[in-house]
């Protein structure tokens, strides 16, 4: 007989495994679906950017609703069900505006899934009376990343047999499997939720923006993390046009996910301790220059396989660096606000705007448009070098 805590763990595993596998089977291949429906690169960029913008708005709005109703489990189940159903709209959709509309609605339903599932998981990971933690959050997220990679590879293999529309069915099936799981897990919230901004919080934004180190951190994120916009939007199309099969493309992308997990869980923090934030930021920026330059010039399979693991440096190491810098310079009572600005401006808004720009760039220059992403990382190098200066404003 399975214990109560074991049953809860299994439900969380199914929830995270199904959610992140659902993300993996569709999101990397969505640009190929749009390309298959004869959308121009400029329109593909618009469609993806519109979805990102909707995710930024919907995640916050739904999180506040879940807090106000004190019903994160029900809201998560409803949003997961809605995402499964809305995603099926890609099957009949034809034409740019209808595809964009489906994408925006799908993004609105998908946006709350990671933060709401994290809210429940963090609550269950908190000490639960004398029994200790129900789950280990970091391990659970690691399982989610592994599920994303497995879904990515599986989807790539099935596309070769059933066509690109298989990603829609896989996504809907996995989200449907995840939908009832939140209702069976405990609601032990670890934090007080997403309160509305107060005048003191608004003043806190001004305090943060006056911290030189914090401004540099956000700008570094905008340049280096934002440079992934071309890859996330057009790498699959670039490889497909070069004759690389969807199955092989899925394996290539999974190399980047695996490298991200390795850096986050194993080598990232020791490397950051050894070379410091400035060295880590320069390494991330330099890796970005190399990665995007190779993407611009060749689709030779060994070369692409060699550069995809650089994602561990261009994304994971840079994220760890930003978190280290934030801890050094931001007052503790402003950490939540600082993280929100970092996530929405440094990552979200910058990536959405760059994705919008990548459409016309890819349409005009094709693969050589990746040089623009290399230029962003090159621009980050001198900024990273300034992190060696004394850290005024460190707490």
Model feature map: region roles:
Residues 74-88, 172, 279-294:
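Structural signature of the two symmetry-related core transmembrane helices
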Residues 57-94:
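Conserved MFS/SLC helix-loop-helix module at the cytosolic interface between two early adjacent transmembrane helices
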Residues 1-6, 185-220:
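Juxtamembrane intracellular "pre-TM" segments in multi-pass secondary transporters
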Residues 17, 86, 90, 96-114, ...:
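Hydrophobic core of transmembrane alpha-helices in multi-pass small-molecule transporters
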Residues 2-52, 213-252:
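Helix-loop boundary and gating motifs at the non-cytosolic
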Residues 103-143:
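Cytoplasmic helix-loop-helix junction between adjacent transmembrane helices
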Residues 57-71, 159, 263-276, 362:
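Helix-to-loop junctions at the C-terminal end of transmembrane segments
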Residues 166-184, 368-386:
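Symmetry-related core transmembrane helices of the 12-TM Major Facilitator Superfamily/SLC fold
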